[in-house]
């Protein structure tokens, strides 16, 4: 409720000084009675009950200790004091309206424009709700999605303000804040007979081609590094930049893939044709970080991180638990 004090330039109007705050809504009700020719019409114009309008005007008269409306006449008209109040009240309400508009405009100008970069697995899983969560903090937001190397270069080059990336070293000078650590897992065609409970990549590659993520991406590099560590790298047959291409091939039974639980949620349109299985050997994980340019306020960066962590936590307890239950115990959010 907006309240304010109104002073008057005549001594005879009130028996005592005006000490009470005047409700701006009561002023609007009073003016509506004058403008619409009665309590009932004013109530209709304001979307209130006639009783509410009558009580508002009565409170205003009590606050000022003066009659504002001549209720004997039909339609009711303002008394001399009411006419004086009406003239000043219109100016006051107009000033308040201008002030509110100015404050809203100033608030919009104070909020930043934000350019946000998201790796595909994040954009496709929590991207939209993340933007919704921070919408009140920004005046304008633009989102780029892509692979970590590209996003890192764009952050370093000043073309992005915030990125969610799986390789913080690609944006040197920006302190990373971890959002997620998740294990690599295997995805197999549901149509594959005699599916193993744990996948040995070398043996599985002897049964089906490995559908790779491109080494242009960080996830592709990480998977390739783990295959080299295992001592034998499967032959290159299929390679894609993104999860959709990888999962489409596996769903058709053309191969199998190494991926992560979040990528599995990203490619959930293929979930009915895929099975997630743990990989053999030590657990190998990837990490996802938030990196912010120096021009981004600490408060905004913290809000983005908190929102992302909350959304990722919900994904783990929901989709990931359903699609890759064996992976959940190896996942750390935040």
What role is predicted for each listed range?
Residues 111-171, 325:
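Central regulatory/effector-binding core of bacterial HTH transcription factors
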Residues 61-80:
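A short LG(V/I)-centered, amphipathic sequence patch enriched
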Residues 63-64, 85-107:
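Alpha-helical linker/hinge and terminal dimerization helices associated
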Residues 173-211:
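Flexible hinge/capping segments at coil-to-helix
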Residues 150, 159, 166, 216-277, ...:
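Hydrophobic hinge/microswitch elements
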Residues 1-20, 136, 261-273, 281-334:
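C-terminal effector-binding regulatory domain of bacterial HTH transcription factors
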Residues 194-196, 209-231, 298-309, 313-324:
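Secondary-structure junction motif
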Residues 31-49:
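Short helix-boundary/capping micro-motifs
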């Amino acid at each position: 409720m907006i309240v304010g004090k109104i002073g008057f330039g005549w001594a005879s109007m009130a028996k005592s000084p005006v000490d009470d705050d005047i409700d701006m809504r009561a002023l609007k009700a009073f003016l509506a009675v004058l403008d619409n020719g009665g309590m009932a019409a004013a109530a209709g114009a304001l979307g209130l009950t006639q009783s509410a309008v009558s009580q508002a005007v009565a409170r205003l008269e009590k606050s000022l200790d003066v009659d504002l409306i001549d209720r004997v006449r039909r339609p009711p008209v303002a008394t001399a004091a009411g006419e004086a109040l009406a003239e000043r009240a219109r100016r006051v309400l107009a000033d308040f309206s201008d002030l509110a508009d100015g404050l809203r405009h100033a608030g919009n100008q104070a909020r930043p424009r934000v350019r946000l970069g998201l790796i595909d697995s994040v954009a496709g899983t929590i991207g939209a709700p993340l933007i919704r969560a921070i919408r009140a903090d920004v005046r304008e937001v633009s989102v780029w999605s892509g692979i970590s190397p590209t996003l890192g270069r764009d952050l370093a080059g000043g073309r992005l303000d915030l990125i969610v990336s799986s390789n913080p070293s690609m944006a040197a000078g920006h302190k990373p804040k971890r959002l997620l650590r998740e294990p690599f897992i295997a995805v197999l065609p549901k149509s594959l007979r005699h599916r193993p409970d744990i996948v040995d990549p070398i043996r599985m590659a002897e049964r089906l081609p490995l559908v790779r993520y491109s080494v242009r991406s960080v996830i592709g590099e990480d998977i390739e590094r783990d295959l080299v560590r295992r001592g034998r790298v499967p032959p290159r047959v299929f390679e894609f930049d993104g999860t959709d291409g990888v999962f489409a091939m596996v769903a058709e039974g053309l191969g199998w893939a190494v991926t992560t639980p979040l990528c599995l949620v990203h490619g959930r349109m293929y979930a009915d044709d895929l099975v997630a299985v743990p990989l053999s050997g030590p657990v190998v994980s990837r990490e996802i970080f938030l990196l912010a340019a120096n021009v981004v306020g600490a408060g905004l960066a913290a809000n983005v991180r908190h929102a992302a962590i909350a959304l990722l936590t919900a994904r783990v307890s929901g989709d990931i638990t359903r699609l890759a239950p064996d992976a959940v115990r190896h996942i750390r959010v935040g």
